[in-house]
Amino acid sequence: MVNMEICAMDCCVFKGLLAERAHKCLILDCRSFFAFSSSSIIGSSNVRLSTIVKRRAKGSMGLEHIIPNEEQRGRLVAGMYEAVVLLDERTSELDMLRKDSTMMLAVNALSRDPRGSRIYFLKGGYETFSSQCPEFCNKNSPPVALSLPLSPNNVPGSADSNCTPCGTPLYDQGGPVEILPFLYLGSAYHASRKDMLEALGITALINVSANCPNHFEGHFQYKSIPVEDSHKADISSWFNEAIDFIDSIKTCGGRVFVHCQAGISRSATICLAYLMRTNRVKLDEAFEFVKQRRSIISPNFSFMGQLLQFESQVLAPSCSAEAGSPTISVLDRGTSTTTVFNFPVSIPVHSGANSLSYLQNPITTSPSC
């Protein structure tokens, strides 16, 4: 139940607020991660509430779920924001919202403890505001892959002079694709094209293979993840390490290119794990996001199972251990440890390939890429 009056804010009033006192305004976008990533209001933050979190919260959501950014949450608690503005796609009346909608849950959480900030919802949502005030919005259309000559013949820095455009595999055509402004995905061939990497501003590469060479170690920073594209491979044990590496390059203002042999299975899996962890989204949403940028991605069935298990960790609410929560042993590259998962249906993160056969996945995958 909302404990204080939530006022509607017209787009013209919101425009004036952004123009004059943007630093005193916290903008919370309650649309999906996919919609937010495609286009959003400059300076806004995305509110992402998983189905698991919604179900367990039973309508009582904590601020840590609504505002995961600690700095923003701290500023709100300290009363440093004059206004908190929430928006979704097109809502014009708050009464039109379902009680379990992301925006209504956010409104309820904020209204219980506003800390001196007035709470508003943007009338007409992003759809209306972006059409009336496009200058205050970022529009990030799915990027087109870099177009450079496919033949590496006579290209300075090329590591392979035996390929020709004739018969070039689909996964080697075009160039690396942008997943995020600092994260790119492609194949081993793309990783051998120094001209492509430099044109994109790549500063580091993650090589997700056991046999693809690191061609330019004196020029780029490399991280190797020696995983085979097989149903027995444990790629999930590398997720956190890969995510930390990407974040470290991002923090330094660099860009990371993730590749395997074809840029279809192993490297796509790492990119999916990164999106799921850092943006707190489900696998199917991350998969759709990446597939729109590189349509041929298809992690093998075992990798999809490991991503589903990773999803259960990423989206599980962080709370104290509860009775009935299973204690399970996981194998971390040969080291046996015990982990307690708080969500009752958690399953081993590093199960062998044989134990993944029961997992039902709606996304079509290929056996190997």
UniProtKB/Swiss-Prot annotation:
Name of the molecule in the record: Dual specificity protein phosphatase 1-B
Any one GO CC term of the record: nucleus
GO molecular function: MAP kinase tyrosine/serine/threonine phosphatase activity; phosphoprotein phosphatase activity; protein serine/threonine phosphatase activity; protein tyrosine phosphatase activity
Modified residues (Phosphothreonine): T168
Protein family: Belongs to the protein-tyrosine phosphatase family. Non-receptor class dual specificity subfamily.
Compartment(s) where it occurs, according to its Swiss-Prot or TrEMBL record: Nucleus
Purpose: Dual specificity phosphatase that dephosphorylates MAP kinase MAPK1/ERK2 on both 'Thr-188' and 'Tyr-190', regulating its activity during the meiotic cell cycle.
Record GO biological process: endoderm formation; meiotic cell cycle; negative regulation of MAPK cascade; negative regulation of meiotic cell cycle; negative regulation of p38MAPK cascade; peptidyl-serine dephosphorylation; peptidyl-threonine dephosphorylation; peptidyl-tyrosine dephosphorylation
Alphabetized InterPro entries for the sequence: Dual-sp_phosphatase_cat-dom (IPR000340), MKP (IPR008343), Prot-tyrosine_phosphatase-like (IPR029021), Rhodanese-like_dom (IPR001763), Rhodanese-like_dom_sf (IPR036873), Tyr_Pase_AS (IPR016130), Tyr_Pase_cat (IPR003595), Tyr_Pase_dom (IPR000387)
